[in-house]
Amino acid sequence: MNPVPAQREYFLDSIRAWLMLLGIPFHISLIYSSHTWHVNSAEPSLWLTLFNDFIHSFRMQVFFVISGYFSYMLFLRYPLKKWWKVRVERVGIPMLTAIPLLTLPQFIMLQYVKGKAESWPGLSLYDKYNTLAWELISHLWFLLVLVVMTTLCVWIFKRIRNNLENSDKTNKKFSMVKLSVIFLCLGIGYAVIRRTIFIVYPPILSNGMFNFIVMQTLFYLPFFILGALAFIFPHLKTLFTTPSRGCTLAAALAFVAYLLNQRYGSGDAWMYETESVITMVLGLWMVNVVFSFGHRLLNFQSARVTYFVNASLFIYLVHHPLTLFFGAYITPHITSNWLGFLCGLIFVVGIAIILYEIHLRIPLLKFLFSGKPVVKRENDKAPAR
């Protein structure tokens, strides 16, 4: 096994946590945006729509880069089989726990909120399966994608490690221009694959499991591998943590293009393919923007930050049904969109933190929502004096 850096990457821990927690304002603003969701306010807000689009345009790309970084770090720490087992347990167990405890009750609630409970028995077997796939995976999709990526990277990481043993990694040089060209080509390649599927057999694109396991994995895998490469090559990591005006300007222009595509694109035309190209390069440039910002402001140890780093996954898991409950039963009684948005944040975050504190005191729930076995400290075993 290769040695791993002893110094903790505090800024990456913090960025990953805040990207996770950013899902809360993202989903609450979705209620008040012009995008159609499970629940929506009576009138959409232009500014909350813009805020929602901004978060959606880059958040998960950067998240998967950090996930790839830490995954390769653990890959060097553990034997291959143990690495796969540890990684799959840490994302798979919380996902499987959240389905019966969170997304199933959420699905049942939405059936009645949207008036679809009566029509459920009339659906075909496939429609029931596909509906359950979309609704039960729901916001847990990234955990499923991480399980798939981890399995694929059993082979990919081995190939990377073997290639490194036969080459001098100190001579590897990266530039943002080269990376931009590569990710532009990856975006075009993904768009070609999607368009080909759309032409050959369009119904498969509406299949929930195909979307999560194949299409989402295919799109985010380059970012996951990029994170692993950032761990391997210090020069690449420095490239991301060094502020770049070019990346900031390019990201801003790409976001404008993203908005224009959202506004004028058509789902029956090339809107989704265009979006994949834009968000592929936008995600790359935002890695530099977010990493450099986080490296400058978040690279320190703090008890408060550590608390939210540890709590971020649980809070994210429970926030989604809380958000939908708020949107279905409380939003209609608040006339102001901005007031509703702020009340939603207080409602969801407040209850999520309370639930987090409760679950910490129940060892079984603590294990199920983290995938980590509860380890008793030696002090706990010592008899009281």
Swiss-Prot record:
It is an enzyme of class 2 (transferase). Its EC number is 2.1.-.-. The chain crosses the membrane at residues 17-37, 60-80, 91-111, 137-157, 173-193, 212-232, 239-259, 274-294, 311-331, 338-358. GO terms for biological process: glucan biosynthetic process. The keyword Nucleotide-binding does not apply. NCBIfam families: PRK03854.1. This is Glucans biosynthesis protein C. It comes from Escherichia coli O17:K52:H18 (strain UMN026 / ExPEC). The lineage of its organism: Bacteria, Pseudomonadati, Pseudomonadota, Gammaproteobacteria, Enterobacterales.
